[in-house]
């Protein structure tokens, strides 16, 4: 959409929190999703600049819009201007190494951005004929993920978990491992999460050289934040702003891009708030009636084309650990892989607390990953499943009442469970243990040795918080000498 040369000016007629009703001249109503701007001064003489997005046409030449920033200081009767186009954000190399808000304005206090090109945040998804369908595995260096829930290049992966089980830490580790190992660029969308986490992430990226603070355009990542303290309009649209930047790198620069979204649940939550403010009737559990459409509009744009790919890793907060809640349940339908985090494993001190039986991936097929990988993964899962079945018997009768074969299964399952833990680079400051990147070949070799019984003589503590199996063997020998 091209902005009209003739300025279309209306008047604010009502303000209810972040929702603004405006009246325009007859025949000049703005379109749905057009950006409206309000400029003026408040009662204290300070300059105001608020951007809104049209959501409803009310009749009587009035529209209802949702503000992307606070509406403090706005009054009825102020002029409101139709820009004639949707909200647009900067795209291209100028975005790298910088932090933007939902409107594409820099918020890192590093001066203006040299913007050469902008792109609207509302765009159609790529056509079916343009999509790339060849499945390729994406190595992350995290044992439990690479073995049991391999990620797809150009796929969508969800990190599901309740509060405090480690979603953001895993996401930061993936950024660290992949952005450093992977040649392409990344875009991080911080949707409705803690401001402190956003600040920590930025500083850690400078330390790990993912962001070059002296020459931002040499950086590997662009950051777009709409944090918890932002109005719901900003939190609802910041995911689209981040995605628009990622799409440019895919479609124009023809690169493989990584898109991190933390947290997709907050995107749904913001949509629910906006829906209520617009007066729509709520649906199941109080969510917006347009939940499926809202999630679909975002997810369908995250895909691989013949020009390049967007591999998306999305943290999904699970309210009250209930995976049947409409927000995580709707997100599930769009994903190629689900990494489910378990509070039970976190309480045992096993990090990353990935549930090896609850997590899934469409890539875990023999014709994609190969017979060796597939066989090892399934053997690990069946051993852990048998251990889970035996836990009730162990709790009532004790280990001694099990058969010799079952005792051996329990012993190996406990070693597998501990070997699925791993020290992270981003957690070094908390744990004091150096992080480890483990290749897929080393991961498969390690689990095969445990399953074959080659390491039955080692104590299970040797397998806890190590990288490769060679480290576990060395640690075991040291513990034996003790």
Swiss-Prot record:
SUPFAM superfamilies: C-terminal domain of alpha and beta subunits of F1 ATP synthase (SSF47917), N-terminal domain of alpha and beta subunits of F1 ATP synthase (SSF50615), P-loop containing nucleoside triphosphate hydrolases (SSF52540). InterPro entries: AAA+_ATPase, ATP-synt_VA_C, ATP_synth_F1_bsu, ATPase_a/bsu_AS, ATPase_alpha/beta_chains, ATPase_F1/V1/A1_a/bsu_N, ATPase_F1/V1/A1_a/bsu_N_sf, ATPase_F1/V1/A1_a/bsu_nucl-bd. Signal peptide: none annotated. This is ATP synthase subunit beta. It comes from Microcystis aeruginosa (strain NIES-843 / IAM M-2473). F-type ATPases have 2 components, CF(1) - the catalytic core - and CF(0) - the membrane proton channel. CF(1) has five subunits: alpha(3), beta(3), gamma(1), delta(1), epsilon(1). CF(0) has four main subunits: a(1), b(1), b'(1) and c(9-12). HAMAP family: ATP_synth_beta_bact (MF_01347). It is found in: Cellular thylakoid membrane. It is a peripheral membrane protein.
